[in-house]
A protein has these predicted regions:
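Hydrophobic alpha-helical membrane-insertion segments
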Residues: 13-20, 89-96, 305-314
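Membrane helical hairpin/interfacial module
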Residues: 42-107
Length: 390
């Protein structure tokens, strides 16, 4: 048996997994206190701010692309819908896995199914994430059925596919916005630059923009590493829609700050103001400015760079809401422990590995890796023989 070639990135991957395995052992057998720098003043850290808030946001490409293709009939984007679906499905599985580390008693998570509190935003988020992950699994089944040539179950799942797409869009819309609603109960704790009654709306708009940015990012990375061609017209089209969503987000965000008379906080010499401008600069100000030039918005390589900026900016946004905006009230500066970071990196590394294996062995892209033979073979072409040769 031939051993895999040792490369730099494979070595990094193994080291991340080993550190994550050790941190997982410490977390399970010694508890949250030994693994994290969380406290009563800072009960939510990187596992909530990044793994949950950012993880759910970064997985938004699934509902964005599936809505475009199957609801708004933008069939030209169908070749990149499956990679977006795979990213969404993996993203939610990893979000659930990461949540288990943050819960003091993870086995109690099942109680959300039986102990209902309809007035709780967290109850709604829990149910929506659970149901949406189930819907994503059902939407992903046709890919598995195609790979193993299971014609009958494939026909059955396709009959209910439209219902699944509609359910997925509704559920994703609900909990993407509800993650913002979680912070509406802390008006005196969250910094004015981030606290607003419009937080659920801003979370949803940014999720749509990030879904498009993630699709551009993953399409570019997949083309580079898996050797298939990059669909330039599709990437350019996604870039134009992303520009529109970023403009909408930027207008709503800045208008909200101005209307609530808190914009002056952005110009004070504070740590919060610095983080706000980093978030705004990377998230929408610089991307909008760059994409106003045709040579940027019509070039896939430059759109890839813009998508990295957008992703970085909105990841900062979620971390600012979860951590930076709370530090002024708590009086503590939260710096995650290395074991927290190693577990987060391990979750991300496992996700990248599973994505790579799925692309290799399943029909994710319209051509190339993992593509099975057609379920119905085309007829053999007939050879025409001239009458004079008979």
């Amino acid at each position: 048996m031939k051993l895999p070639k040792i490369t730099f990135w494979r070595t990094v991957f193994v080291l991340i997994l080993l550190s994550g395995a050790y941190s997982t052992y410490v977390r399970i057998f010694h508890g949250l206190g030994a693994t994290t720098n969380l406290s009563d003043a800072t009960p939510w850290g990187i596992w909530i701010g990044f793994d949950i808030l950012c993880g759910v946001m970064l997985a938004a490409g699934g509902f964005t692309l599936l809505a475009a293709v199957h609801i708004f009939n933008a069939k030209e984007y169908k070749p990149i819908a499956r990679p977006a679906l795979l990213t969404a499905f993996l993203g939610y599985l990893l979000v659930i896995a990461a949540l288990m580390f943050d819960l003091g008693k993870p086995w109690n998570v099942i109680r959300v199914m039986f102990t209902w509190q309809p007035r709780s935003v967290m109850f709604e988020v829990g149910w929506c994430v659970m149901l949406y992950t189930t819907v994503l699994f059902l939407e992903f089944l046709p890919i598995i059925f195609e790979r193993f040539r299971l014609e009958k179950p494939l026909r059955i799942i396709r009959r209910i596919s439209l219902v699944l797409y509609i359910l997925g869009i509704l559920l994703s819309t609900l909990h993407q916005s509800s993650l913002g609603s979680l912070y509406l109960i802390v008006p005196g704790k969250l910094h004015p630059l981030w606290y607003t009654p419009m937080l659920p709306v801003l979370f949803w708009i940014s999720a749509v923009a990030i879904g498009l940015a993630m699709t551009i990012f993953e399409s570019s990375m997949s083309a580079r590493h898996f050797g298939h061609s990059l669909e330039k017209p599709l990437i350019v089209g996604l870039g134009r829609i992303m520009l529109v969503m970023l403009i909408i987000y930027g207008v709503v965000r800045m208008q909200n700050l101005f209307t609530r008379d808190v914009l002056q906080y952005a110009f004070m010499p504070t740590y919060e103001a610095t983080m706000f401008w980093l978030e705004a600069g990377f998230g929408f100000l610089l991307p909008i400015a760059l994409m106003l030039f045709p040579r940027v918005r019509e070039n896939p390589s430059r759109l890839y760079f813009v998508s990295v900026l957008v992703i970085s900016g909105f990841v900062l946004n979620r971390l600012n809401v979860a951590a930076t905006g709370m530090e002024g009230f708590s009086g503590e500066t939260y710096i995650p422990k290395w074991t927290e970071v190693s577990i987060t990196l391990s979750v991300v590394a496992v996700g990248i590995f599973i994505f790579t294996m799925a692309v290799k062995y399943l029909p994710i892209f319209s051509h190339g890796h993992g593509k099975p033979e057609p379920l119905v073979k085309p007829p053999e072409p007939k050879v025409l023989v001239p009458a004079t040769a008979r």
